[in-house]
A protein has these predicted regions:
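Glycine/proline-enriched, intrinsically flexible loops and inter-domain linkers
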Residues: 1-340
Length: 340
């Protein structure tokens, strides 16, 4: 995603990293960012066809990640960018977070027939459709022009509200199971919560009109959570969401029949057995040949150093040893330090 739309791709890198532990009801306290790029000082005319210039990717991605982290109020304690020609084909964008919560506040139970599933947070749009497959498929020179919609659009303030809400013990203890909306959207985030499900796509809040059932089912719009609660706790949970100015609606129920059923405009558009879904697709095998590592020319091999001054100056001229102070200072590393 960062190769195609650097700002949004890097922002959702951090947003997704925060949502993963958040679905486990843990609060994220710290983040780190390690990236890899080719030489951003290369002239524009040396850019590979069908790719953005490295300088554009490097600067916009840093803006995207830091913008999301600074808005949500997450301390980014370590930032490092590595430069190597191997990253000219595909950039490396790694975001990692550290999260924790009191064990007594985290409830993990099975979904029972009759339980209600609430969709919490952001609205659903066309952004992110195909993002899961897009990050793994083979891209071509045309990807930069036609795959922009696969990149999700983050909304840090909304995710901050979910963080604040889930941090409250009285809220966290109402949640039996929870999934964040990542790859696959409604069909996966809700589809994984129980063996039998009846999902009403008409109830899914939309960013705008015109979305069909397929788009509602697979959109990967950001800042959404699927929460399983007992029927008697639904009104209480919706009340807590309203206090945080979060949109929350009931969109599905757990059923006894082990089937995933999605309805749209009064019609059933998906009806799949859980046994089929649990096969995870066709069984695949492949043959692998491992090559023995070449021990010659390794970084640990002792070499004769000729002109020490020349080697020293060459090393100092490397992008990997230059100061990254300007990059690091884009990220707030102390936010929350004085919060009790």
């Amino acid at each position: 995603p960062t190769e195609i739309e650097p700002f949004g791709g890097a922002a959702t890198c951090l947003g997704g990293a925060i949502r993963d532990p958040l679905s486990g009801r843990t609060y994220v306290y710290q983040a780190m960012r390690i990236t890899g790029a080719a030489d951003p000082t290369k002239p524009l005319n040396q850019t590979l066809k069908g790719k953005l210039p490295q300088r554009k990717i490097v600067t916009e991605a840093a803006h995207g990640y830091s913008s999301y982290g600074n808005q949500i109020g997450l301390a980014t304690g370590y930032v490092k960018e590595l430069y190597h020609p191997g990253y000219v084909a595909k950039r490396m964008e790694i975001g990692a977070v550290m999260a924790a919560a009191p064990r007594k506040n985290v409830i993990r139970e099975t979904s029972d027939p009759g339980d209600v599933i609430i969709l919490l947070g952001g609205r659903t749009g066309r952004d992110g459709i195909g993002g899961a497959t897009g990050s793994s498929k083979v891209h071509t020179e045309a990807s930069i022009e036609v795959c922009g919609a696969e990149v999700q659009k983050g909304n840090a303030p909304t995710e901050r509200k979910i963080q604040r809400m889930f941090r409250r013990p009285e809220v966290s203890r109402l949640i039996k199971k929870c999934n964040d909306f990542g790859a696959g959207g409604v069909s996966v985030a809700i589809g994984e919560l129980a063996d039998g499900l009846l999902i009403d796509l008409d109830k899914v809040p939309k960013k705008y009109a015109g979305l069909d059932g397929t788009e509602l089912a697979i959109s990967e719009s950001q800042e959404r959570m699927a929460v399983v609660v007992d029927p008697k706790d639904v009104d209480t949970f919706l009340g807590y969401a309203k206090e945080e100015n979060l949109e929350a609606v009931t969109v599905a129920t757990v059923t006894e029949s082990p089937r995933l059923v999605l309805t749209w405009r009064g019609k059933t558009i998906v009806d799949l057995s859980r046994a089929f879904l649990d096969t995870n697709g066709a069984h695949q095998e492949t043959d692998v040949t491992l090559e023995v590592p070449n021990h010659e020319g390794t970084p640990f091999e002792k070499k004769e150093v000729g002109d020490v001054k020349e080697k020293w100056l060459k090393m100092l001229g490397s992008l990997n040893v230059c100061s990254q102070k300007g990059l690091v200072e884009m990220f707030d590393s102390s936010i929350g330090a004085s919060t009790v």
